[in-house]
Amino acid sequence: MAGVVDTLSTVGRALQGALTGRQSYHLDVPAAPDAAALSVVSFEATERLGEPYRLKAVLTHPLELARENYLRKPATFRVTPADGSVPRLFSGWISQFSRTRTTRDFCAYEMELRPTVALLELTTASRIYQQKTALQIIESILRRHGLEGHQFAFRTRREYPEHKFRLQYQMTDWDFVRLLMEQEGLYSYFVPSRFGTHLGEVFTIADDIDHYIYQPALHVPYRETAGLESGAETVFSLQTHARTVAASFMAADYNPDHAYERLRDEANLAFNDKGNYGQPYVFGTHHLDWKGARWEAQLRHEAALAGQIVYEGESNVLELCPARILRMDAVLPDAPHGQVVTEVIHKGGRDQAYRNTYKAIPSGRRYRLPIDERKWPRIAGTLSGRISAPDRYKYAYLTGEGRYVVRFDFDFDAWRKGGESVPLRLAKPFAGGLKTGFHFPLLDGTEVAIAFHDGNPNRPYIAHALHNSVQPDLITHEGRWPSRNVIRTQRNNKLRMDDWEGHEGIKLSTEYGGKSQLNLGYLVDADSKQRGDGFELRTSGWGAIRAGKGVLISADDQPAASGQQLEMERVRSLLQQALQSSEALAEAARTAQAEAADCARQRALLDDTLDQLKRAGLLATAPAGMALASGADLQLSANENLIATATNHVDVSAIKRFTVAAGERISIFAQRLGIKLFAARGKVEIQAQRDEMRLMADQNITVTSANGRVVIEAKDELLLKCGGSYLRMSATGIEDGTRGERTIRSNGMARQGPASLAQSMNEMSRTAFNDAYVLRNEITGDPLSDHPYEILRDDGSKIVGVTDASGRTSVQKNQDVERIRIRILPKVGKA
């Protein structure tokens, strides 16, 4: 192999020596052993600010070349000036290799040379960048492609903001870098590496006029040609193109983190230029504050002004390159300090001397890449992702603003769990102020569809959630489920609405409290079999029904739910009938001098409280019957009156005792069929412990002892009267009298000395209500010692006293239950 290489090198040198004239263009490929024999027929190199250059060369070689020795191999193209000065170098790698012609004498080839950074054009990626500036993002991309720190450089003046989120989606790495430069006001160019051509050229990113290439100074004459060339470096053609651009720019956007106002500002960098007109308004520039709005407007105006005046020239100046400052002896009113080159197209060949065409702008203007937002990437539709939470957090992992972290399905980079994206907003069917909204939490692993505001990849939000094979839909084709509308949470809190025809129903349930449920309509069990209809409210925990204005519980039907909420005509009619019955019986009781029912109170209850629930009452009604049952005790209590009315019978039964106690009076009145009091066993005792007892009948009164005695006893006197005749018995004697005859029928009569029976009167027990009351300060609760008070009784009497050291009043002794009022009097000398 070494012999072949030596032979080819010898052939190459011989060919070069045999050529007439000098060879100014060379392509060096160190990895190709036969590259020395390459001869450049022609070349064209295109350089622009913000783009990797592209050099195409047509070459010949006496042999057929192996593709693998050239394609993707480092190479350097040299343009050597005729005066032997420093050559112009293009260092990079061969990106294209084509054999275009083969003859007996040579083979023709076309090759393309690109800089190292052009490798970024070959990699399409989707990647997320967080909490990085644009420069940091660009550096990370360059390093990912193997570029070292000496192969690129940043020369910037502006302080670049840190972006919370940037998305590269289905873009080549170079297109994404180019996009960042356009959006951030950056441009790029290449300079020779001081470490040698084998490392390529240095990719330089800059942002201001200070970073143009000023040294060494390039000052050339402007000389138009007349068909002849002197060979000296000159600019021999120059055109100036000017156009009207916008006089200013306005930029605005909405930032939900500063939702109180839309962020808007404008920029005018050429107040004195009267040739400009208009103010384009750009909305959606994704700035976060007022400073950002001003910068976005300024950037767009700088880009417009950079393209306002463009010079197009032709020259043979080999040093021309993007970002180079070019000065001429011609006067350019708009470029008193020279031009900055933005584009150069180099050409040359065997039959053509080197020359170039170039474009430039006044060097006093900041160069900005042309901004064409129509070409910026837009994501139509949505991307898939998964909700992400750290440490398998079992509830919704939310930020203070209610946002979620999402891992995009295209993203395979290593992120900490719960840090795969910035927190994203969730689009909801309803949202608003005053804490209004609609919220169902998204849990770790939930699939979501991610949309983008205006299609901007840098502005994602969660559009909705979806089911998948791992998290299947809760409603499928199984059974009767297609008719169901269901909301179900991870802990089986559920709202189910079934639209199956004829079996419509609603279920609201939670697992807590042993399945607390509200079931409406057609009630089914777990197997969808009917277990009832109507409604059911149940729980294994506590239950409470509260209504501050009143409660109506009714078993009266309202077909098709057509009536009013407090429809109660039927129950009001029943209560009115009951009231009328009570009033009739009360009138009869009053006629019989019995105690009448308090019908006025009953009417007030109906009219003032129960009717339409004018006050906070409870009304329960059932047309076919009602029952209250308790496994233990049942209590009915009223602070005022307890009223019970029946059109027919009132039946009260007690297996053991039946007690009735009244603080004042018990009145029992039977209008027609009388009263029966029976005791199958045990005594029947009737006592009037503090007053008289009267037994009265319109006809006979019978007192009978079937198997014992009848004892009638009185302490002072026993008096029997009938038709004027009488028998009076007392401790001092017996007296009888009659207006008619007195007949004594007996078998005999005995008269003996005085005698009497011992008195065995029953003593009446007294129920004493002896109470002392403690008066306390209503704020501190401390007893009011030695404090005057006044007690008012129901009979109008007053008792005035002073409390003792413990705040107690004097003992109040009463024979009966009695209401009293206690007034706390002011101490003497105090208000």
Q: PLM features: what roles do these ranges have?
A:
Residues 1-831:
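Amphipathic alpha-helical and helix-coil boundary elements used as assembly
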